[in-house]
Amino acid sequence: MAEDLDKPLLDPDTFNRKGIDLGILPLEEVFEYLRTSPQGLLSGDAEERLKIFGPNRLEEKQENRFVKFLGFMWNPLSWVMEAAALMAIALANSQSLGPDWEDFTGIVCLLLINATISFFEENNAGNAAAALMARLALKTRVLRDGQWQEQDASILVPGDIISIKLGDIIPADARLLEGDPLKIDQSVLTGESLPVTKKKGEQVFSGSTCKQGEIEAVVIATGSTTFFGKTARLVDSTDVTGHFQQVLTSIGNFCICSIAVGMVLEIIIMFPVQHRSYRIGINNLLVLLIGGIPIAMPTVLSVTLAIGSHRLSQQGAITKRMTAIEEMAGMDVLCCDKTGTLTLNSLTVDKNLIEVFVDYMDKDTILLLAGRASRLENQDAIDAAIVSMLADPREARANIREIHFLPFNPVDKRTAITYIDSDGKWYRATKGAPEQVLNLCQQKNEIAQRVYAIIDRFAEKGLRSLAVAYQEIPEKSNNSPGGPWRFCGLLPLFDPPRHDSGETILRALSLGVCVKMITGDQLAIAKETGRRLGMGTNMYPSSSLLGHNNDEHEAIPVDELIEMADGFAGVFPEHKYEIVKILQEMKHVVGMTGDGVNDAPALKKADIGIAVADATDAARSSADIVLTDPGLSVIISAVLTSRAIFQRMRNYTVYAVSITIRIVLGFTLLALIWEYDFPPFMVLIIAILNDGTIMTISKDRVRPSPTPESWKLNQIFATGIVIGTYLALVTVLFYWIIVSTTFFEKHFHVKSIANNSEQVSSAMYLQVSIISQALIFVTRSRGWSFFERPGTLLIFAFILAQLAATLIAVYANISFAKITGIGWRWAGVIWLYSLIFYIPLDVIKFVFHYALSGEAWNLVLDRKTAFTYKKDYGKDDGSPNVTISQRSRSAEELRGSRSRASWIAEQTRRRAEIARLLEVHSVSRHLESVIKLKQIDQRMIRAAHTV
């Protein structure tokens, strides 16, 4: 076959030139044109075809790296700095002084430094993201060398034979072969929400999703030659402005408006009133522009998100949408599946509890029938549990010939096999949901009451039920409906809770995240699982969501019922969507876990869609975050890390707003009251050193909030105004003491510099530099900044920057910047002054936060730190233990100081504690009864365990 590969028909463009449409030709001709067979390709042939057709992925537009670099200097904040640069060489060119090339060069350097850091960090983040997304690459089962293999979909070529099953995203355009009809969701291509039925010979398109069925297909087009690829080339990508970008824009606009107000005041007073010279006035305006613009903000925040995304991936949570980190930090409700998330999804069958419904069968026969109705390959948890109960897994197909296998689908909720036994008789066996199997059976009315009674008895013990039935097929045809179905038995399935689920749920509740169990199992099973996990038993059937329940809770509004419930049972995918929708309407930030194709709508609707480990391709494509490790603890760890990331971003925004207000107000007052002119070049030095230091905040050591986070812009602006005003007044006071008093000369024996404007500028430079950079230690902490150790990198950067600033102030003699060194004694005085006025910043922070939220003093006293590393679970010190004092607060206190969501979480946590106490009490009573029955001396036991 390899020697035929050079024939022109395999050229991707040949089919178009010759008018050959592989989508409508008979299958025999398709195989002939593609020179393949139902046995698939050989690896060598596939490799040669891959060279001809290229990888099975859409062509990515290569962006010019230089244009991309320039793009980092094209945003509103950069525009202001670029305007300042133009002012330095154009407007400042007067009075025979010439353009201000020094300031122009400094501004350009500042822009280039920020653009360079942004460029390289985004490249690194992009490479890291590409590596992470490679782990989520679409997989497919392909028939190569006569064997089925799981491979990346990118290696598919025309002529490959692939397997398509429930939940798969179709990896390439293909024609269906022998097998059951498929239900295909083509909404991504056509916009049509209803799935369409596809049978043998029909074409399926890349990007659509298999909703039901299982079948083989031959690939006829890959990559950009697929229907999806051709469509994508006609559509220009559009950038959607997300919430995070809106936040950045709002903060940037606030800073720009603050600077504009200061500039207008200076222009109005300096020129008409004070009659200042033109060049000096321009220099004062440059000080506000250069010092007030948080030019590093886009870089700092994007780098923080990128580093946080990498940290999450190390914890088993891959972020597909970067801003999902911000939303996860604010999540206050988590709707999670029971199976696989709260439990191990490692099912076991208790053979002793199997119920047999036909006289001529025993428990082993029931197990054998269930095994025959199970897959031996690509097993789900139920198939694996059933087959493992057989003495030898091969027994499931021993002495029979399989004719047809019906895989599980969410509609029928059962699997079935048609087979011929050793006597040549035809049978069909099925296993699945008891309700579905019972509806098939002829004796339904006679046995229904007994079946439901057994199901309820199993459910009270936390056991799921699996029904088994069979029928004879006298017509000996796979298409025959067969004879009457016989209900054979019920198998109990036990899915044990994860060992850490109970503790993790309590931790989530204490963090203000309500965990709601969403399960398709019975209500009794859900309540029993909730009791075992200690998450409460306030659960309802799915019918209550539609107002169909007639119990004592029917008077409760649906939205309130959903908000207060611990979980829901018997849930279908449409119920999940409705739960998310109602919670969002009640202003909750909702996370939803899912693994199946039918979970996709709810995952898309949720603020944070979370695809659990081993989720289907459809669920992964709809989710914002994909878990690589099972269990709830991964999600809670991701919540803590997201809050830490959010805290870093919030800390920086408060810092940036404070510095803007401080520069604008402080230097405007100095220019208008004392007619003091600070050199613009020195503001540039401050900005460069500040930006270099503040970049390290992306790796700072922070304390995640004990409650869900959100962008409270009004609070950020108000905090920035208060702190910035204080710092501005401190700087103004410092200037006044230097030029109008002899305080420093008398008490510290330094020489007077009041009449030396260049030395005054050096002193002002050092004071502004110290207090500006030290402010980050205040904004980064929720308690006393002296007692919360920053990250090592931040400390190191601060020391280096301030060492440079101090050396400049002490020794510099820069004529064009008009500064002269002030010596070490003055530097020591300035450091002492800055330290004295640094201390009240914490007090101002507490008082202001207390005025806004009433929580500040609790934060002062409560210094427990929540960890962000999964490896730290279970440690006593430095672990994510939530503050004990928060657990003991009353509901009234919570109503007054937190959101309603946190209050609900507290109520849920209390119900969970009650459920746990009941569990402990029941175990205790059981132990006492055993001790009495065995006539064991309890005093000996107590003595042996007494310290």
Curated annotation (Swiss-Prot):
Organism annotation: Arabidopsis thaliana (Mouse-ear cress)
Residues annotated as binding Mg(2+): 595, 599
NCBIfam families, per the entry: ATPase-IIIA_H, ATPase_P-type
CDD domains: P-type_ATPase_H (cd02076)
Catalytic residues in the record: 337 (4-aspartylphosphate intermediate)
Catalytic activity: ATP + H2O + H(+)(in) = ADP + phosphate + 2 H(+)(out)
Membrane topology (UniProt): Multi-pass membrane protein
Extent of the signal sequence: none
Gene name for this UniProt entry: AHA10
An MF annotation (GO) of this entry: metal ion binding
Protein name, UniProt field: ATPase 10, plasma membrane-type
Keyword Transport part of the UniProt annotation: yes
Cited SUPFAM superfamilies: Calcium ATPase, transduction domain A, Calcium ATPase, transmembrane domain M, HAD-like
